């Protein structure tokens, strides 16, 4: 079989930078899926992407499908011929449909009978005749939320398309994509190199585009150049570039021919909190800030231009001119904001509604303050500082800086709190109240920060559930799932002695008559239980382990964690499988019992040796188990219970639980109930698979 390399490039207008990688990856994934469906073999496949192009390269693609033999079974021989041995209409119709006569058919014998059979040889289709349709289907499945039309064309795509290049080796693949006929034309850089050129062979795509078109189509290579050159540029001025990957990806998606340059700004701007300057440089201008080795912001930034200039200083001066007014705005906001303290801004919070039924932001911070103080008493934190931090937690929302740069909420609160003479613990708590902000973000660890972060999230959760606006489906406008996971993570990662039932009840009490949902406490608790499951599944914990713990509904996150670890460990023990099965059997037996069982086991009614042995073993373990369960040492407790495996197995082998004698039966049920009760102190082991 012959093979050749395939190139497909879609030349467009500037593509959305934040979507570029995803579009290219999806295009490749969709197309390779099409190849697999078409039974076309290939060695490897890669994607390339630049601001004005999406491309995929398939290496060593088979030039045709392999020929194959398809077995087509006909009617059973008994129905294929009549009593005289002549073909029936069914047999002749089947044969005609397969282009043969009945006499030419083979026979297939199986244990269920004998059938007519035709082994049809199917000749593989040439690859080049399939490519265009496969490519179009691949493009149709791209994740494009808002496709657009252009000109008089009815075709839709994420951006207008100007060229389509499909080359199988040196041959142009005939066909049309997105209303554009395939050709070998490749467009180069807008301002450098050849504006367009003809590509002679798919193998030469990257090299020709680089040398003729001045475009680096290899996304990863372009990203690596930017990273390496930016690091070198920062080192040259004695600093370290802040090359956050999201911004690095975005910049990579904005340029075809990256040139890294270094610029500066006036040192006076360094009096403004660094976060505000960094936000301006990264968010608005797509610049990389530079820090010294001590983590202090330097009056420099690194940027990437899309052109090689004979006078780079002119480009540097232009970028410095652009960023200066933005930094000056930040300086003005900061100086203006300093004129009022955070406490003085509390009054203005009365004018801002948090949620119509839940009152103003001022009422919200009063609740957060009380809640934070309440939590502080449970974790040995300073309740006055916690309450103070809660009260000031939203004051920075009324500052010019946060109104202009909303992502700086909390951060600017910290800076203003320090300027106002608040304690460092209070200041840091204002900054950390929204943590964790995203998956993988760190959680607060300082006591006052913990109190405020929990209070802030609980106020939102209980409030929104309390007015009947719980998340439905994928919609979660108040980010309640993130808030709930945040509460759980803060409690778990700090091993806090807090119970969700108490926290929910306190938050409900503080909301008072605002809440109209009578079931708010139970609904919020159930919401937390669902988040427990989601969180632990993300951590790789087996679902059956999670369900075993959830069955007991432990409401203290730290306690939930201890049980999860204990059950996960128990599951690895040799005895686990047998004891899980025994617990399931016991559970099923007890579920069918009507009426109450004896409160205690009557030793006089223990007749069989196996039931005596189990009762003795259980009685021997109970004094050891009680303190372990009291101390939430579930792992050691379950390890002790694992020693019951032999006694339990023997019991079920030798003892008839549902004896005819009512007293014996009830005593045995009481024994099994006592056994199950010990396991249930930790989890429902019967749910383990």
From Swiss-Prot:
Domain of life: Bacteria
EC number: 6.1.1.14
Pfam families recorded: DALR_1, tRNA_synt_2f
InterPro entries, per database record: DALR_anticod-bd, Gly-tRNA-synth_bsu, Gly-tRNA-synth_heterodimer
Biological-process GO terms, alphabetical: arginyl-tRNA aminoacylation; glycyl-tRNA aminoacylation
Keywords of the record: Aminoacyl-tRNA synthetase, ATP-binding, Cytoplasm, Ligase, Nucleotide-binding, Protein biosynthesis
Subcellular location: Cytoplasm
A GO molecular function held by the record: glycine-tRNA ligase activity
Keyword Protein biosynthesis carried by entry: yes
Catalytic reaction(s) noted: tRNA(Gly) + glycine + ATP = glycyl-tRNA(Gly) + AMP + diphosphate
One GO cellular component term noted in the UniProt record for this chain: cytosol
HAMAP family: Gly_tRNA_synth_beta
Family: Belongs to the class-II aminoacyl-tRNA synthetase family.
Quaternary data: Tetramer of two alpha and two beta subunits.
Annotated PANTHER family: GLYCINE--TRNA LIGASE, CHLOROPLASTIC_MITOCHONDRIAL 2, GLYCYL-TRNA SYNTHETASE
The protein's name in its UniProt record: Glycine--tRNA ligase beta subunit
Top-level taxonomy: Bacteria, Pseudomonadati, Pseudomonadota, Gammaproteobacteria, Alteromonadales
């Amino acid at each position: 079989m012959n093979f050749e390399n395939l190139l497909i490039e879609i030349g467009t207008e500037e593509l959305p930078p934040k979507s570029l990688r995803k579009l290219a990856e999806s295009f490749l994934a969709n197309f390779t899926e099409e190849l697999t469906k078409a039974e076309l073999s290939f060695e490897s496949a890669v994607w390339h992407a630049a601001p004005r192009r999406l491309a995929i390269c398939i290496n060593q693609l088979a030039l045709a499908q392999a020929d194959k033999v398809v077995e087509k079974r006909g009617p059973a021989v008994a129905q294929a011929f009549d009593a005289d041995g002549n073909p029936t209409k069914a047999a002749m119709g089947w044969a005609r449909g397969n282009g043969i006569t009945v006499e030419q058919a083979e026979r297939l014998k199986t244990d269920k009978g004998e059938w007519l059979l035709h082994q049809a040889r199917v000749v593989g289709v040439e690859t080049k005749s399939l490519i265009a349709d496969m490519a179009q289907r691949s493009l149709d499945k791209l994740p494009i939320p808002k496709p657009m039309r252009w000109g008089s064309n009815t075709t839709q795509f994420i951006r207008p398309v100007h060229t389509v290049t499909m080359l199988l080796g040196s041959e142009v693949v005939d066909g049309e994509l997105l209303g554009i006929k395939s050709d070998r034309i490749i467009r180069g850089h807008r301002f450098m190199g050849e504006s367009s050129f003809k590509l002679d062979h798919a193998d030469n795509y990257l090299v020709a585009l680089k040398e003729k078109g001045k475009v680096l189509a290899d996304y990863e290579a372009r990203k690596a150049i930017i990273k390496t050159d930016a690091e070198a540029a920062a080192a040259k001025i004695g600093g370290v570039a802040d090359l956050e990957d999201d911004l690095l990806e975005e910049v990579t998606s904005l340029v075809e021919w990256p040139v890294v340059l270094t610029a500066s700004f006036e040192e006076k701007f360094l009096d403004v909190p660094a976060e505000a300057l960094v936000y301006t440089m990264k968010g608005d201008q797509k610049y990389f800030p530079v820090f010294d080795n001590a983590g202090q912001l330097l009056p420099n930034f690194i940027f990437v231009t899309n052109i090689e200039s004979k006078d780079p200083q002119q480009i540097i001066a232009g970028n410095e001119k652009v960023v200066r007014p933005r930094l000056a705005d930040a300086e003005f906001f900061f100086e203006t904001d300093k004129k009022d303290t955070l406490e003085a801004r509390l009054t203005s919070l009365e004018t801002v509604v948090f949620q119509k039924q839940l009152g103003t932001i001022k009422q919200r911070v009063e609740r957060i303050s009380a809640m934070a103080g309440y939590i502080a008493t449970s974790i040995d934190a300073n309740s006055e500082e916690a309450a103070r931090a809660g009260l000031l937690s939203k004051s920075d929302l009324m500052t010019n800086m946060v109104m202009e740069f909303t992502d700086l909420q909390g951060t600017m609160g910290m800076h203003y709190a320090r300027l106002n003479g608040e304690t460092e613990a209070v200041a840091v708590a204002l900054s950390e109240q929204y943590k964790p902000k995203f998956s993988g973000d760190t959680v607060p660890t300082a006591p006052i920060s913990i109190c405020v972060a929990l209070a802030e999230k609980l106020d939102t959760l209980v409030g929104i559930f309390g007015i009947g606006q719980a998340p439905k489906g994928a919609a979660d406008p108040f980010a309640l799932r993130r808030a709930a996971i945040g509460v759980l993570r803060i409690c778990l990662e700090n091993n806090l002695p807090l119970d969700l039932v108490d926290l929910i009840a306190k938050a409900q009490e503080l909301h008072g008559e605002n809440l109209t949902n009578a079931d708010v406490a139970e609904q919020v608790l159930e919401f937390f239980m669902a988040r427990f499951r989601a969180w632990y599944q993300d951590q790789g914990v087996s679902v059956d382990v999670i369900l075993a713990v959830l069955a007991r509904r432990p409401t203290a996150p730290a306690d939930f964690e201890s049980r999860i670890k204990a059950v996960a460990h128990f599951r690895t023990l040799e005895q686990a499988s047998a004891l899980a099965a025994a617990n399931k059997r016991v559970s099923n037996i007890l579920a069918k019992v009507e009426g109450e069982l004896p409160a205690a086991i009557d030793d006089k009614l223990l007749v069989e040796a196996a039931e005596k042995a189990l009762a003795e073993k259980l009685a021997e373990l109970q004094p050891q188990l009680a303190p372990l369960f009291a101390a939430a040492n579930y792992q050691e407790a379950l390890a002790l219970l694992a020693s019951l495996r032999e006694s339990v197995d023997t019991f079920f082998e030798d003892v008839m639980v549902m004896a005819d004698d009512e007293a014996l039966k009830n005593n045995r049920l009481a024994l099994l109930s006592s056994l199950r009760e010990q396991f249930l102190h930790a989890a429902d082991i019967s749910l383990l698979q």
